[in-house]
Amino acid sequence: MARFLLLLVAVAAAAAVLSLGDAAPSTAEVFWRAVLPESPLPDAFLRLLRPDTSFVVGKAEAAGGAARTGFPFDYTDYRGSDSPTTASGLDLAGDFGEPAPFGYDYSAQGEGGGGGAAAAAGEQVLAVDAGFNYDKYVGARKLRGGSSTAGGENDDEPFGYDYKAPSSGSGTAASTTARGVGTGATTTVFFHEEAVRVGERLPFYFPAATTSALGFLPRRVADSIPFTAAALPAVLALFGVAPDTAEAAGMRETLRTCEWPTLAGESKFCATSLEALVEGAMAALGTRDIAALASTLPRGGAPLQAYAVRAVLPVEGAGFVACHDQAYPYTVYRCHTTGPARAYMVEMEGDGGGDGGEAVTVATVCHTNTSRWNPEHVSFKLLGTKPGGSPVCHLMPYGHIVWAKNVKSSTA
């Protein structure tokens, strides 16, 4: 225990030093600029390397980033299950089966996976008043110990999509229609690749950015803290997190997700420091010649408004690595290969939404081979397609990142 107390002091001291801002770049920042000289540090990473002093207000508050709210979307879980699952297909109540590579469901493809009443080709898909989530599979209320029953109230999970196949008694409405909250305004969720072209208009709502309480820890500190499910009780004590809290549930889910074995055809890893994140992406892509692609979005979010596509810059390559921040007191990223895909950097300009137009750039991934996806995946129902059909596209929200190798861009 004495060792963990010393680590806690080191964590708090490191965060306090980092909070001094631009006085001196961190070791991780120097590392990034040395190995990725042509890739600017994403704004989210700068925030995580230089967290606010208000984040370090005691052990309990320091763990406050473990259970974040308002993450309604998930674009990486394609398997089916009758039980709530974690990112790697783990049943939160116990293991229930082996997930397939990339999270796809390798079971026999059923008939009628396309959902004939969905939107026509070329149209974006709309859902009701919410932001984006790429890695939460059971909603924020579930992490806090609340009910995640379909149709129940869920103030923190505006869309309430569960990206598993619906159980036999759930019907299709809950898995194909968003649960409305707030104003009932609409925002784009999935869209066809045809929408990624100059002149198209897509409605988006961007929620305010959230970060882990301590941000990126110095690598030496992160490597000193056990990152295993077996060590979770000691880590909870280290950060002053009670075992029966939402924070503990979020941390437990993150650890179980990261510890799930790598499957054939899949490359995945979890990174607890910026250096480990970069090195992991290099290993997954098989080269040190990589570049980071991140959306440029306002930290404070932006109200729902129509965005006109002004430029589309294709990114060379057919496979990428996507990384999503996880629930933990300090920054942890879960990364995975995307499978066959095309990527774009899409420049858009908002019409104002009452607050004046704002230019944004969104990293966009279009999955080009969905033949192994679960036929009940909600994107098929919303887009009116089926496994093996037209590409399924989505953007990467603030703080998420796509890695590519030998990146070159040209205006489309």
Curated annotation (Swiss-Prot):
Q: Mind telling me which InterPro entries this protein's record contains? A: BURP (IPR044816), BURP_dom (IPR004873)
Leader peptide range in chain numbering: 1-23
One Pfam family name is BURP
Keyword list (alphabetical) reads:
Glycoprotein, Signal
Query: Per its UniProt entry, which superkingdom is the organism in?
Result: Eukaryota
Q: Which residues are glycosylated?
A: 369
**Signal as UniProt keyword:** yes
* BP GO terms, sorted: pollen development; pollen maturation
Describe the outcome of a gene knockout: Collapsed pollen with low viability. Almost no seed production.
What residues does the BURP domain cover? 190-406
A single Gene Ontology CC term: exine
Where does the entry say this protein is expressed, by tissue?
Specifically expressed in anthers, in the tapetum and microspores (at protein level).
Q: What does this protein do?
A: Required for pollen development. Probably synthesized in the tapetum, packaged in Ubisch bodies and transported at appropriate stages to the micropsores.
The entry's protein name is BURP domain-containing protein 13
